[in-house]
């Protein structure tokens, strides 16, 4: 089963604040929107995504996106529905792998595994960032990006792992100048959250390991939580 939570986990491991929103939400409040496996498009969703990207937003979708309408009826076109020109690709078919099967791709000098779902996409103007390395679709795009208007549209054609997602989202967050809650690379088992009022920022450092961890000059004992305060 595909777990959208993997994307959430990867983003919060970059120590940024995250909202979980619906398709009906106001997209204009955000600089980056990640919509993994957005299988069903509600009426108006495609237009909202198009406008968001055109106006300078960064939008990321994956395989199995834009396939059916609100009645679970398939669109009569290649996914993602009404957005082939925006994302610069057409997803023509999906190879569903057995649990024991894997593929791989190389991105920025590092090899990552692919599992379960592999879209076979044709380029429609997008730039290829990585390609499959095995099987009959070796050489086909697995990760693409496409400039549209003032924004950027990314397409992930396959399911990878949290390690890749964390690395990839780190790059996207850097490119879009989204600030970290704390300036730090990921520390295993440490979660960082923030809350703010009119005067202060409260940063919660939480260690979910029995072993001690260090982050931002702070040492956390096993399962310890520290709260840092800073005036805004």
Predicted regions: what they are:
Residues 1-232:
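Carbohydrate-binding surfaces of carbohydrate-active enzymes
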